Amino acid sequence: MVVLFKAGSLGPATNSFIIAATRRGQIRLYNILQDTTIPEPKRKYIPSSGTYPKGFRVSGTHVGVKAANTKYPDLALISSDKPCTAAAAVFTTNKFQAAPVQLSKVTLEQRKGKGIQSVVINSGCANAVTGKGGLEDARSMAAKVDECNGTSEPSTLVMSTGVIGQRLPISKILDKIPTAYSNLASTHNAWLATARAICTTDTFPKLISRTFSLPSSPGITYSLAGMTKGAGMIHPNMATLLGVLCTDAPVDASVMKPLLLHAVSRSFNSISIDGDTSTNDTIAFLANGAAGGQTIASSTSQDYAALQKVLTSFAQSLSQLVVRDGEGATKFVTVRVQNSPCYDSARRIASTIARSPLVKTALYGRDANWGRILCAVGYTDGVTEGTVVPERTSVSFKPVDGSPTLRLLVNGEPEVVDEERASAILQDEDLEIIVDLGGGDKGEKGLGGEEAVYWFCDFSHEYVTINGDYRT
């Protein structure tokens, strides 16, 4: 059963857009996220503490970008005490790029990845497809933050998320930016409030932090922190999804973009909720070097390899939180395509499976319909000739409890499936699907060693309800 409440129908205390699904206790409040609305199963993903990078301060401030939001943070500010030694970002590939995307790309190009000091983010309005006026609004936001930082050079990246085609209440935002700046802090609560401020239909704030060391400076403990938002319109191909990653490690601007591209390709570009690529997708990575040590300036150095490994693993953990908060989702699914002659083909196949509505609805219905998975493998575009050979292809389910893998198809031949066990496996929230290509036609089975992993969720009735009432 799904119960809908219109804005204002329950009085001022709940004057918000609420969609509640009793099947899993999910509650979706558009742009108004508070402790009382976070579903109990999702609370385990919210950190109670963290270790945050030196020299970064953050804040979450209430503006009221959407009129229904009368008290909760919807303006996030992330700022380094000193200009960052390096910054990079990966942006949406959608042709209708939002004004903040256009502006931030130009700013990074002008600064050549150096001297970026802040990121300002509003939720509640995407500032996308808003013409010259929207671009001017984004410029005004950046300029106001630069003014607070005491610099006349462009040093602020801008992000926005929310409804497409509407102008920002720019005066309200500009009036509150000085407040956001004065509220900057380095505490865990400040980081959590900032992560909350960028949420829209998210049911919980997505924030993680991690410490690491580098081979050249084993005595220094570095920190990496990141926040992201997204629950729908998620099929990035940087590629609504936003993310900011910050570290106090010393990184040269020349290697910043390759580090981020590698991490994003194996994390944020390897997730899917509904197959839609947003106009606003942006992942930014800032390094201020505040922890000291030797600067990472070469892509062949041990430090570079170490940071690349840490950053990629970190980005995967952060991006997976987006999938776990997929609109209406009841399952977190890992699809692993292995023994492919090349990585790109394996990734294309994994992406196609993750986007398939038939696969996603079968999983929601707890139906072990492996034919839909195989069908998606077979129609995948752009794979290398000979990658998919039916008589060498196998499909199986890997349970999360450590019990033996359930084989569904082996070398092109269907197995006699224990439907009761299959149904039991599909009762769990987490599931792994393994597609083994057997090396394609490059030799005997197993000689193709490339593997790609994608993370996605199922499609439920609630997904339709949430998006059918998105602007209502």
Curated annotation (Swiss-Prot):
Biological process annotations from GO: L-arginine biosynthetic process; ornithine biosynthetic process
Known EC number: 2.3.1.35, 2.3.1.1
Site (Cleavage): A239, T240
Keyword Mitochondrion (UniProt): yes
Coiled-coil spans in chain: none
PTM section of the record: The alpha and beta chains are autoproteolytically processed from a single precursor protein within the mitochondrion.
Active-site residues from the entry: T240 (nucleophile)
Highest taxon, organism lineage: Eukaryota
Enzyme class, spelled out: transferase
MF (Gene Ontology): glutamate N-acetyltransferase activity; L-glutamate N-acetyltransferase activity
Pfam families in UniProt: ArgJ
Positions of substrate binding: T200, K229, T240, E327, N467, T472
Catalyzed chemical reaction(s): N(2)-acetyl-L-ornithine + L-glutamate = N-acetyl-L-glutamate + L-ornithine; L-glutamate + acetyl-CoA = N-acetyl-L-glutamate + CoA + H(+)
Record site: Involved in the stabilization of negative charge on the oxyanion by the formation of the oxyanion hole: T161, G162
Biological pathway: Amino-acid biosynthesis; L-arginine biosynthesis; L-ornithine and N-acetyl-L-glutamate from L-glutamate and N(2)-acetyl-L-ornithine (cyclic): step 1/1; Amino-acid biosynthesis; L-arginine biosynthesis; N(2)-acetyl-L-ornithine from L-glutamate: step 1/4
Keywords tagged on the record: Acyltransferase, Amino-acid biosynthesis, Arginine biosynthesis, Autocatalytic cleavage, Mitochondrion, Multifunctional enzyme, Transferase
Function per UniProt: Catalyzes two activities which are involved in the cyclic version of arginine biosynthesis: the synthesis of acetylglutamate from glutamate and acetyl-CoA, and of ornithine by transacetylation between acetylornithine and glutamate.
Additional detail: This protein may be expected to contain an N-terminal transit peptide but none has been predicted.
Protein family (similarity comment): Belongs to the ArgJ family.
Subunit structure: Heterodimer of an alpha and a beta chain.
Protein name: Arginine biosynthesis bifunctional protein ArgJ, mitochondrial
Organism of provenance: Talaromyces marneffei (strain ATCC 18224 / CBS 334.59 / QM 7333)
